[in-house]
Curated annotation (Swiss-Prot):
<feature type="transit peptide" description="Chloroplast">
    <location>
        <begin position="1"/>
        <end position="52"/>
    </location>
</feature>
<dbReference type="InterPro" id="IPR037045">
    <property type="entry name" value="S8pro/Inhibitor_I9_sf"/>
</dbReference>
<keyword id="KW-0694">RNA-binding</keyword>
<keyword id="KW-0150">Chloroplast</keyword>
<dbReference type="Pfam" id="PF21864">
    <property type="entry name" value="MORF_dom"/>
</dbReference>
<dbReference type="InterPro" id="IPR035979">
    <property type="entry name" value="RBD_domain_sf"/>
</dbReference>
<dbReference type="InterPro" id="IPR054059">
    <property type="entry name" value="MORF/ORRM1/DAG-like_MORF"/>
</dbReference>
<keyword id="KW-0934">Plastid</keyword>
<dbReference type="InterPro" id="IPR039206">
    <property type="entry name" value="MORF/ORRM1/DAG-like"/>
</dbReference>
<keyword id="KW-0809">Transit peptide</keyword>
<dbReference type="GO" id="GO:0009507">
    <property type="term" value="C:chloroplast"/>
</dbReference>
<dbReference type="GO" id="GO:0005739">
    <property type="term" value="C:mitochondrion"/>
</dbReference>
<dbReference type="InterPro" id="IPR012677">
    <property type="entry name" value="Nucleotide-bd_a/b_plait_sf"/>
</dbReference>
<protein>
    <recommendedName>
        <fullName>Organelle RRM domain-containing protein 1, chloroplastic</fullName>
    </recommendedName>
</protein>
<comment type="function">
    <text>Involved in C-to-U editing of chloroplastic RNA. Functions as major chloroplastic editing factor. Controls a majority of the chloroplastic editing sites.</text>
</comment>
<keyword id="KW-0507">mRNA processing</keyword>
<feature type="domain" description="RRM">
    <location>
        <begin position="295"/>
        <end position="373"/>
    </location>
</feature>
Amino acid sequence: MDAARASLLLAGGLAVSTSTSAVATAAQTVSIPHLSPHTRRRRQRRFLRLASAAASSPPPLPAASAQPHCSRWVVVMERPPAPAGGGEVSRAEAVDHYVATLARVLGSQEEAQMRIYDASWDGSYEFSCEIDDEASRDLAKMPGVLAVKPDTDKVDMSEKDNHGSGLSAANLGNFSDAVSNHSSSSGENEFWLVRMEKPGVEVVTKAQMVDHYTQTLMKVLGNEKDAQVSIYHISWERDYGFCCHIDEECAKELADVSGVLSVQPDTNFGSDNKNYKGDDSFKSSEATQAEVKTKRLFVTGLSFYTSEKTLRAAFEPFGELVEVKIIMDKISKRSKGYAFIEYTTEEAGGAALKAMNGQIINGWMIVVDVAKHRSRDRQPPYSASGRSNQVLRSRYHTG
């Protein structure tokens, strides 16, 4: 009976508190019919080893365990397969390849999209994602994956004042040299602190805010790369804004961009202690946006997987829609990441502009602006490198 009880306890994964001698006695008295003496002795010896191991091992962990800790990883990839028509791999094709690779580990394409927060496809092929340690080990075994390593560029946000992020020491030194050289030859300021309106949603990620700031600055500078290298500090949790290196003329233009509260000289350059709070003398973007009247909106920051049906459902509550048009790449037949929305009335367009700017659709924070000309349907903004100005993820250090 004791042996049977010990056997049941072992099968249930519980520790057995019994002496080896007692177990030996029980094992010898167990009747196992239809077995040869040799097989019976072998099973008795195995029973003794299991019981002894169970008696000496610590109790098992509770059934309810904490969720696995997720860390940030940089995944270095081989060059994605060349397009059917030849030529360079486009951004959309590279992102699709990264998502498909990660989805093989996570089991869901949607989950893979949400986990990727940074990507590179121009010259080097890699992406950054937030997954647990076990998933990172599985990912390292996937075909086409060269390496999976911790994302050491990410700095603990608790070490930053006001939850801001600054440059690396090397880059900060380069900017300091630029300040010194510029000050000796000109009295003009080129380092600015930009206060931004709070997004229209309660929860956003750091990567989404970086995208938002980059797209805002792109409206003045004209291309993605210049916007990325100009930003040297961001704030994104309690107060919203960024610091950038631009000339005074661009700073004046930036102050008139939708969502910008103010543009001031960065009087505390070289330090992470920035004042993004401002005061009551700054303009009210609420009042500015309330005066906007437009039927036609330009939406950027869309996920490549957002459909016109999803976009229509998001914008329809503000009024009757005339058109919802996502601009597609003619070769890949995939979304370019931006769209045009048109309402029957200016009131509906103005309400949608105010409410939808900064909202999250399919995990991506969108930017909504007034559509200036219909020609933009045919000619999207391009950077000097020839790539669309739609931002995927910033590739500069943000902490």
